[in-house]
Amino acid sequence: MLSRLYISNYALIEELDIAFDPGFTIITGETGAGKSIILGALTLLLGGKADARAVRNPERKIVVEATFDIAGYALEGFFKDNDIDYDERECIVRREVSATGRSRAFVNDSPVNVGDLKEFTTRLVDIHSQHSNMLLATPNFQLAILDSLAHNDRLLAAYGEAYRTMLNA
């Protein structure tokens, strides 16, 4: 669950720090209130395309950072596979974009490539907007949800280890 979103130097946003309460969150507002800008920053954080044109002040980089409450999620395997420090309660994801468009991504302060970032964050956030396709229709997401609800993280980690051993044999 997204518990905090920090945005700095993105489009019209100089700095914004939002704390979310537990439960369902809806972002609403009048036309021009900035909903799409916040959604754009969140999309960037989740592995979306970095665009140097979104840099508000070219002397500073864009920083979008989110804190997630991951208690109860089956994510330990991702952290282990990517050699990232694991905290079963909380995870911090950060994306930075320079004025030249160069982008860096981090999970718990460990650098990750954008592909791994996308894979990881699809397990944390599902954005639904008008006319959008739902991630719920993808088999991988359905399996991840079932495994998470069944608390299969240890079984999945053991399977992954056995599979890697078989591939390396």
Where are these regions (language model features)?
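Gly/Lys-enriched N-terminal cap/neck module of very large, oligomeric protein machines
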Residues: R4-M166
